[in-house]
């Protein structure tokens, strides 16, 4: 009789542990899909961005200050998380859909990458047809770099973004560093400042294209008179 009581008590104990473990896992999954544990991006001041050193990707690279990109006409700049990532390729293609309108407004579209691995940049160019530059010190990914690692595997937004990119026919590889999150900037001409700063909160977090266009329309191209003032 005592054996049956012990067995029943043991079964109830194991059932309670199982329910508790399931509840803890469900709570962890729920919390992982909120923004509670995501690192908050630090806004990049114009002065910080202006002083970033970029390199061209030619055989004989030229180093220049990033402000050259937007000084006259402003610019839209994509900080690419990883060129070989199919999510990044989908983001780039999405942004490229604005190229005709940007050309009409006279605003250039650029991308920066944090490393040049094998042919990753060349293989990225079919999705992004603007000029691409190297940001070796990863300054466009700061001032405080944010990473997403294992949490990305359990976030529903990442799975949705992945499905959307896969359904769109995008594919990729695992070459290069892909944990440091990227973003998109719209920067006005001269000292007009940062008009839009989109920081990825998770893998495949695309910028709102209407927000990009709204910000671009605020750019005031520099004239000889405004450059002298």
Curated annotation (Swiss-Prot):
What is a GO molecular function of this protein? antioxidant activity
Does Secreted appear among the keywords? yes
Q: Which CDD domains match?
A: PRX_like2
Q: GO terms for biological process?
A: regulation of osteoclast differentiation
Q: In which tissues is it expressed?
A: Expressed by the principal cells of the epididymis. Detected in the head region of epididymal sperm (at protein level). Expressed in bone marrow.
Name the domain of life this protein comes from: Eukaryota
Question: Where are the stretches annotated Thioredoxin fold?
Answer: 14-112
Query: Does Transport count among this protein's keywords?
Result: no
Choose one Gene Ontology CC annotation of this protein and give it. cytoplasm
Q: Where is the active site?
A: 85 (redox-active), 88 (redox-active)
What is its subcellular localisation? Answer: Cytoplasm; Secreted
- Induction cue: Up-regulated on CSF1 treatment.
Q: Which InterPro entries does its entry note? A: PXL2A/B/C, Thioredoxin-like_sf
Q: What keywords were assigned to this record?
A: Antioxidant, Cytoplasm, Redox-active center, Secreted
Matching PANTHER family, A to Z? PEROXIREDOXIN-LIKE 2A (PTHR28630:SF31), PTHR28630
- Miscellaneous comment text of the record: The active site cysteines correspond to the redox-active cysteines of peroxiredoxins.
The task this protein performs is described as: Involved in redox regulation of the cell. Acts as an antioxidant. Inhibits TNFSF11-induced NFKB1 and JUN activation and osteoclast differentiation. May affect bone resorption and help to maintain bone mass. Acts as a negative regulator of macrophage-mediated inflammation by inhibiting macrophage production of inflammatory cytokines, probably through suppression of the MAPK signaling pathway.
Family of the protein in this entry: Belongs to the peroxiredoxin-like PRXL2 family. PRXL2A subfamily.
Protein name from the UniProt record: Peroxiredoxin-like 2A
Gene source species: Rattus norvegicus
- Taxonomic path: Eukaryota, Metazoa, Chordata, Craniata, Vertebrata
């Amino acid at each position: 009789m005592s054996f049956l009581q012990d067995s029943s008590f043991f079964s109830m104990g194991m059932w309670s542990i199982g329910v508790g473990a399931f509840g803890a896992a469900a709570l962890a999954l729920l919390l992982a899909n909120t923004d509670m544990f995501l690192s908050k991006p630090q806004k990049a001041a114009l002065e910080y961005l202006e002083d970033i050193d970029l390199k061209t990707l030619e055989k004989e690279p030229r180093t220049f200050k990033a402000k050259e990109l937007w000084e006259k006409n402003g610019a839209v700049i994509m900080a690419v998380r990883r060129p070989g990532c199919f999510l990044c390729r989908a983001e780039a293609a999405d942004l490229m859909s604005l190229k005709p309108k940007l050309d009409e407004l006279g605003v250039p579209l650029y991308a920066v990458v944090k490393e040049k691995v094998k042919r990753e940049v060349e293989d990225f160019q079919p999705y992004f047809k603007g000029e691409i530059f190297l940001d070796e010190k990863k300054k466009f990914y700061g001032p405080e770099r944010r990473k997403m690692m294992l949490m990305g595997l359990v976030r529903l937004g990442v799975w949705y973004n992945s499905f959307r990119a896969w359904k769109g026919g995008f594919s990729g590889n695992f070459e290069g560093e892909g944990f440091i999150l990227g973003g998109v900037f719209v920067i006005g001409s001269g000292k007009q400042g940062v008009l839009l700063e989109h920081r990825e909160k998770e893998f495949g977090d695309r910028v709102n294209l209407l927000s990009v266009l709204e910000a671009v329309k605020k750019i005031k191209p520099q004239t000889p008179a405004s450059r002298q003032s």
